[in-house]
Amino acid sequence: IYNSDKLIIIGNPPYNDKTSIVQNHIKNKNYEVDVNLKCRDLGMSFLLSFNELKADYICILHPLSYLIKNANFKILKKFFSNYKLIDSVIISSQIFCPYSLGFFPIIIALYEKNEKGINYDFIKNYNFKTIDDKIFCLNDFDFISKYIDKYPNKNRVSDKVAMFYTMRDINALRRSKTFIKKDCANAVYVPKSKYSLYCYVDVFKQNIKTVPYYFGNCDIMIDYNKFKILEKDFIKASKSKILNSKILDYFENLLGEHYAN
């Protein structure tokens, strides 16, 4: 390939986080990788390789989490500094793995080489569209991470009234615990002042079937002002496991057109 050649890359590279415990037994082989491309996720390594090739256009399938999770976006900074997302559509991994126990959003993304690239603010304000003709923008929502600790915090919290399991995204919440009784490395200490917010997450999990697949890699959404009005209801629902009509209406209003019956 000559530097003067126009290069278009189209593909669906493998992607898998080698540090994940899921199916870890098939990820324990190490291979020599260019130091500029080495990454914990194979799909990320492919994107970085496309940047090294200086492709003019790239049309590729990859997990939506590469874009919407800020930590992933930072890992791919070299790529996003040179490419702009100009079109996309989101599909479910169910298309490829219909018998999988869990589905996640995949984006079919068209990138154009651009010397300005994109930053995370661009992603937060980008209108993502799905194959189901839904459109969403991250900045249309507020998220729970603004108000509570999602990861172990025992070095900072001494007055705990409860313990909660480590939180990640909505898909992780689908399969993880919420409140826990036994301390562990993944325990988040819950102070009294934040207890109702952790109850909110617990109730969110109870109603998680109404959250569509394309929000799977998002943080847990919240309308804080409306939550405060129903704060006692959320505490009660967390304990009783019964969601009253006010809470059900809250979630329907929170998700709007994205509410999945």
Residue ranges of predicted features:
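C-terminal target-recognition/interaction regions appended to catalytic cores
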Residues: 164-261
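Flexible, glycine-/basic-rich loop-and-beta segments that form/coincide
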Residues: 103-161
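Conserved Class I SAM-dependent methyltransferase catalytic core
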Residues: 37-94, 109
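Short catalytic/ligand-binding loop motif for oxyanion handling, primarily in non-cytosolic enzymes
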Residues: 16-20, 66-71, 118
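Mobile active-site "lid"/loop adjacent to the S-adenosyl-L-methionine
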Residues: 19-39
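S-adenosyl-L-methionine
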Residues: 1-5
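Short, conserved secondary-structure transition motifs
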Residues: 94-102
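Internal, well-ordered alpha/beta segment that forms a basic, Gly-enriched binding/recognition surface
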Residues: 8-19, 50, 58-59
